């Protein structure tokens, strides 16, 4: 059972001004994270000294990021930890810089694909991976005993410094994921950065690799992150690609860790498609399947994807939802590719967290390796009809038993030809529903049966 009360599936997240996302709480969170670092150094036999502790601190473009960043800096400084600030930078960029600077912690202020009224905090360790549940739980314990704890003595207070060129470092890192022998010359690509953290870097990545780049969602004003743009609104990317006669469109979300693509015919490609395309490309590598190992998806990945990988002889396994759980299973199995339909794709020989720009580059690389268009590669697998829905926890007290009974009935009816998933969200007070079936109408009816069962009351 998950004992964490502040952290969810992707850090701490909430409405700005709420108990979990106020300057007061963020100061406490930063102080607790700083004490967590000091504890770890003590255990490792290298206690901190003046100026020895520092963290990378990045953010997206939300208006609240300015105040929460200041609160985070103040909290860290008061317990002797310096903050190296990147300014707006995609989450995978902060993960990369944490490793590159050999620092013990990276921090991102972002609520990912959520609207500007939300914000969040997530932490990365020295290896660029998100902290484990146990590490997050320890930080929570330190938050709860924070009141009354003394500040560091004046001589050991931390500093705040800007990292010059953080964005350019990240651009070069992304470009290194694309072979030097290949170029994007001749391609016109629409890049949609969701008015978020990637607004100043995503376009540069593709332009500097030779593409003719047109920008969408690259005019942040603090309030328009994910507002009708980005990976959560692919219909606008598709429209822009068609209107501009572009070859492809690449949409990332507000913090740049997920990606969706569109082609010149208006076809959209989600994370499931990208997993298949990238895997097909990697099977052409010198060591092929031996190097790839297998592919990790989540419980939300379409059944058709699993069937397609089976035909290729590629092992496939499912994790829980969230790129942290995907990565955990990848590492456990020693596999190099994983992701989820929402667009989080982890290519482990390139980066150890989801990265929207790198995922798109890997898909474009697969095109060149296979000598096929994205459409042709993705057409090699077929989706099983799927319907999704949800209900609010506030509307359905004691829903578990009612939904369990209906779930068992549906699974018995579908047998091996479909799938039923009931999953409480890790970031919102809702329960998500998924039914896959041979026909869409059957899937839709299944979701409605589950929803009505939940709302039926006692």
Regions found by a protein language model. Name each.
Residues 1-2, 119-244:
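Gly/Ser/Thr-enriched, mixed-charge loops and adjacent short helices
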Residues 44-60, 188-191, 293-299, 336, ...:
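Short glycine-rich phosphate-binding loop at a beta-alpha junction
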Residues 1-74, 78-79, 105, 159-187, ...:
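An N-terminal, well-structured beta->alpha segment
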Residues 246-248, 286-458:
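Phosphate-binding and adjacent anionic-ligand microenvironments
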Residues 93, 137-172, 264-341, 346:
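Proline/glycine-rich low-complexity loops and linkers
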Residues 10, 57, 94, 107, ...:
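Buried hydrophobic positions in well-ordered alpha/beta secondary-structure cores of metabolic enzymes
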Residues 130-132, 215-216, 267-286, 356-366, ...:
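Gly/Ser/Thr-rich active-site loops/lids in small-molecule metabolic enzymes
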Residues 39-48, 53-118, 204-262:
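N-terminal small/polar loop signature for handling phosphorylated ligands or for N-terminal nucleophile
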């Amino acid at each position: 059972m998950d004992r964490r009360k502040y952290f969810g599936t992707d850090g701490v997240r909430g409405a700005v001004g709420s108990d979990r996302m106020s300057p007061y709480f963020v100061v406490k969170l930063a102080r607790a994270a700083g004490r967590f670092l000091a504890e770890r150094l003590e255990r490792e036999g290298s206690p901190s000294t003046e100026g020895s502790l520092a963290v990378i601190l990045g953010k997206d473009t939300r208006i609240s990021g300015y105040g929460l960043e200041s609160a985070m800096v103040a909290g860290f400084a008061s317990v002797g930890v310096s903050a190296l600030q990147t300014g707006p930078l995609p989450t995978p960029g902060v993960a990369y810089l944490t490793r590159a600077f050999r620092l013990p912690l990276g921090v991102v202020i972002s609520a990912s694909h959520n609207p500007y009224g939300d914000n969040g905090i997530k932490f990365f360790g020295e290896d660029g991976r998100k902290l484990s549940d146990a590490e997050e739980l320890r930080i929570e314990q330190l938050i709860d005993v924070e009141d009354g704890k003394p500040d560091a003595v004046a001589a050991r207070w931390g500093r705040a410094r800007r990292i010059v060129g953080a964005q350019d470092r990240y651009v070069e890192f992304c470009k290194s994921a694309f072979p030097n022998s290949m170029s994007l010359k001749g391609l016109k690509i629409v890049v949609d950065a969701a008015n978020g953290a990637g607004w100043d870097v995503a376009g540069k990545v593709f332009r500097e690799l030779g593409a003719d780049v047109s920008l969408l969602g690259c005019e942040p004003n603090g309030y328009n992150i994910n507002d009708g743009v980005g990976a959560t609104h692919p219909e606008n990317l598709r429209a822009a690609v068609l209107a501009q006669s572009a070859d492809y469109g690449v949409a990332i979300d507000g913090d740049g860790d997920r990606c969706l693509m569109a082609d010149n015919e208006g076809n959209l490609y989600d994370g499931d498609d990208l997993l298949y395309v990238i895997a097909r490309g990697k099977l052409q590598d010198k060591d092929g399947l031996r190097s790839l190992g297998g592919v990790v998806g989540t419980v939300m990945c379409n059944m058709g994807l699993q069937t397609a990988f089976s035909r290729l002889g590629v092992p496939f396994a499912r994790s829980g939802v969230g790129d942290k759980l995907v990565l955990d299973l990848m590492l456990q199995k020693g596999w190099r590719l994983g992701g989820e339909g929402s667009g989080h794709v982890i290519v482990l020989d390139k980066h150890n967290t989801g990265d929207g720009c790198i995922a798109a580059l890997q898909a474009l690389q697969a095109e060149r390796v296979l000598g096929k268009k994205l459409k042709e590669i993705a057409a090699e697998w077929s989706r099983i009809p799927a319907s999704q829905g949800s209900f609010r926890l506030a509307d359905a007290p004691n829903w578990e038993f009612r939904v369990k009974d209906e779930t068992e009935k549906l699974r018995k009816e579908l047998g091996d030809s479909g799938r039923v998933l009931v999953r409480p969200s890790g970031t919102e007070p809702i329960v998500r529903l998924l039914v896959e079936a041979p026909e869409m109408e059957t899937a839709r009816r299944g979701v409605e049966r589950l929803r009505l069962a939940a709302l039926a009351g006692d």
